[in-house]
Curated annotation (Swiss-Prot):
One of its GO terms (molecular function) is protease binding. Belongs to the band 7/mec-2 family. Flotillin subfamily. GO terms for biological process: positive regulation of cell junction assembly; positive regulation of cell-cell adhesion mediated by cadherin; positive regulation of endocytosis; protein localization to plasma membrane; regulation of receptor internalization. It holds the Pfam family Band_7. Gene3D superfamilies: Band 7 domain. May act as a scaffolding protein within caveolar membranes, functionally participating in formation of caveolae or caveolae-like vesicles. It is found in: Cell membrane; Membrane, Caveola. Keywords: Cell membrane, Developmental protein, Membrane. It comes from Drosophila melanogaster. It is a peripheral membrane protein. PANTHER family: FLOTILLIN-1-RELATED (PTHR13806:SF46), FLOTILLIN-RELATED (PTHR13806). This is Flotillin-1.
Length: 426
């Protein structure tokens, strides 16, 4: 019996069971203390096991028998305590060969099942898919035993009927066909490329010739442009010389004109000085006395204007005062006449027709005087008579009296007052 401190390498695990533990103590790649009484220690391998999974003559989904050899790497999982405990329950006390056999049988069963669900072409062309399906299905099943599938791959694929060989021959024929087609296409492409190269060579040659011709043309054009520029420069130089000569002549003429202008300016200055002298002389002899006389006359006119204004203002004031006096007199007279008229109106209301008769009698002499007034202005009167009635002054007097006698009737027609009746009644 082993007791005390017990150790193990990283490729195995210690399983301590007995007293003091409700479940076994699992120590992967470490050490543990084991009591001599009531406890025991066991070991389980954690080595990776390589399995060669043979599946001979398995019928695929198409009914074609093929044989597959797969290589799987499996081991007891020591990092997961639950899986390690499961592995201890399943394999503790068993040898690696026994564990290998259990895992191999399980993998072979899953491999055969996957082969039966796929076609030969699928397994042959997509080995990765086949390996993945076997790996996934077997991993979940072996995990329940505490074993992990590290890897799985197909080592060999074969058949006894020559099916795979036929597929290979067909593929070989396709490859040969594709090779011949590729060779023909390559030759055609080579011919095409040769033609393109020749075309490019000719195009390059033509382009080169064109460039040479263009360069020659550019040279000729530039040479002609240079010749034109040289001729232009020569012409410009000649024109510049002529222009400079013309400018020189023009400048000489301008200077001559400037001299004439200066001389004329001096003459004008002399004339202006003479004019100023004469103006000063004129101002001393005529203008100043005239201005003095003008000032005197302006002052006299201003005095007369002031006098006239004052006289006009005095006259206006006199007229205003006289007008006010006359207005007062007229107002007083009008007031007296109004009072007299009021008294007459009162008398007229009292005496009525007698007052009217009295007023008319007072007016009749004035009417007779106005009737005879034109006669008083006559310087000479010539009387013509037919011989009947009055003649001479008597005739004229009778005419006047006849007019006067018509006045009472006229008054009666106008006012309705009978003067003759009123006088007799009075």
């Amino acid at each position: 019996m082993t007791w005390g401190f017990v150790t193990c390498g990283p490729n195995e695990a210690l399983v301590v069971s007995g007293c003091c533990y409700m479940k076994p103590l699992l120590v992967p790649g470490g050490r543990a203390f084991v009591w001599p009484v009531g406890q025991q220690v066991q070991r389980i391998s954690l080595n990776t096991m390589t399995l060669q999974v043979e599946s001979p003559c398995v019928y695929t989904s198409q009914g074609v028998p093929i044989s597959v050899t797969g290589i799987a790497q499996v081991k007891v999982q020591g990092q997961n305590e639950d899986m390690l405990l499961t592995a201890c329950e399943q394999f503790l006390g068993k040898s690696e060969a026994e564990i290998n056999h259990i895992a191999l049988v399980t993998l072979e069963g899953h491999q055969r099942a996957i082969m039966g669900s796929m076609t030969v072409e699928e397994i042959y062309k997509d080995r990765k898919k086949f390996s993945k399906q076997v790996f996934e299905v077997a991993s979940s099943d072996l995990a329940n035993m505490g074993i992990t599938v590290v890897s799985y791959t197909i080592k060999d694929l074969r058949d006894e009927e020559g099916y795979l060989r036929s597929l290979g021959m067909a593929r070989t024929a396709e490859v040969k066909r594709d090779a011949r087609i590729g060779e023909a296409e390559a030759r055609a492409e080579a011919h095409i490329k040769e033609a393109i190269a020749e075309e490019q060579r000719m195009a390059a040659r033509f382009l080169n010739d064109t460039d040479i011709a263009k360069a020659q043309r550019d040279f000729e054009l530039k040479k002609a442009a240079y010749d034109v520029e040289v001729q232009t420069k020569k012409a410009e130089a000649e024109m510049a010389y002529e222009l400079q000569a013309a400018k020189t002549k023009q400048r000489i003429k301008e200077e001559q004109m400037q001299v004439k202008v200066i001389e004329r300016t001096q003459e004008i200055a002399v004339q202006e000085q003479e004019i100023m002298r004469r103006e000063r002389e004129l101002e001393a002899t005529i203008r100043r006395p005239a201005e003095a006389e003008k000032f005197r006359m302006e002052k006299l006119a201003e005095a007369n204007k002031q006098r006239v204004v004052m006289e006009a203002e005095a006259e206006a004031e006199s007229i205003r005062i006289r007008g006010e006096a006359e207005a007062f007199a007229i107002a007083a007279k009008a007031k007296a006449e109004a009072e007299q008229m009021a008294m007459k109106a009162e008398a007229y209301r009292e005496y009525r027709e007698a007052a009217m008769v009295e007023m008319l009698l007072d007016t009749l002499p004035k009417v007779a005087a106005e009737v005879a007034a034109p006669l008083s202005q006559a310087k000479k009167i010539t009387m013509v008579s037919s011989g009947t009635g009055d003649i001479g002054a008597a005739k004229l007097t009778g005419e006047v009296l006849s007019i006067v006698n018509k006045v009472p009737e006229l008054v009666k027609n106008i006012t309705g007052v009978d003067i003759a009746r009123s006088v007799h009644a009075g």
